[in-house]
Amino acid sequence: MLNVFRIAGDFSHLASIIILIQSITTSNSVDGISLKTQLLYTLVFITRYLNLFTKWTSLYNFLMKIVFISSSVYVIVLMRQQKFKNPVAYQDMITRDQFKIKFLIVPCILLGLIFNYRFSFIQICWSFSLWLESVAILPQLFMLTKTGKAKQLTSHYIFALGLYRALYIPNWIWRYYTEERFDKLSVFTGVIQTLVYSDFFYIYYQKVIKLGGDLELPQ
């Protein structure tokens, strides 16, 4: 049975990637974008899809895995190119991108080792990717608090990325009733991720949707 929530979530994720790439290429700048968050997302998708060529579910799943891995790597390449194309903006981004990601990666490794469905390398990496994805946006939000504002395209990107995971909550409910499947790890980490975005969603609605301007944090 067609799961519209899953598809809507995936396309929201694709939209966030397109918005981010457009923001970098049209402005020729990485102003307000966290390289550390992009590195974390790349790590998320690489560790989650280690079974890319060994476990076949559907053509849709296979293509989405390819898109998410390749696009996350492509974004990092685009951002690194700005070091030479726009060195001033790139250095400014590096200066502001100060979140210590080791404090995210190490606990997520430990959680992956403790909470998994089978103590195997692929399963531990899969669990690690869920925990890491739930907090991967934190360097971006931390940068936002340091600058106090974000361009419209950047805020649209963060919103679409948060919406993707929020849509997975009704997806899990749908799967529970249609497939009698309940993935506790995915649900728990997904709820954490949605809560991480909650303040941003409210400010985005108030500042960007209602007023149509750039996103600015309240003083």
From Swiss-Prot:
Residues 1-3, 55-62, 117-123, 175-184 are lumenal. Its main location: endoplasmic reticulum. GO terms for biological process: protein retention in ER lumen; protein transport; vesicle-mediated transport. InterPro entries: ER_ret_rcpt (IPR000133). Keywords: Endoplasmic reticulum, ER-Golgi transport, Membrane, Protein transport, Receptor, Transmembrane, Transmembrane helix, Transport. It is found in: Endoplasmic reticulum membrane. GO terms for cellular component: endoplasmic reticulum membrane. One of its GO terms (molecular function) is ER retention sequence binding. It comes from the Eukaryota. Residues 23-36, 83-102, 144-155, 206-219 are cytoplasmic. The chain crosses the membrane at residues 4-22, 37-54, 63-82, 103-116, 124-143, 156-174, 185-205. PANTHER family: ER LUMEN PROTEIN RETAINING RECEPTOR. Belongs to the ERD2 family. This is ER lumen protein-retaining receptor. The lineage of its organism: Eukaryota, Fungi, Dikarya, Ascomycota, Saccharomycotina. The gene is ERD2.
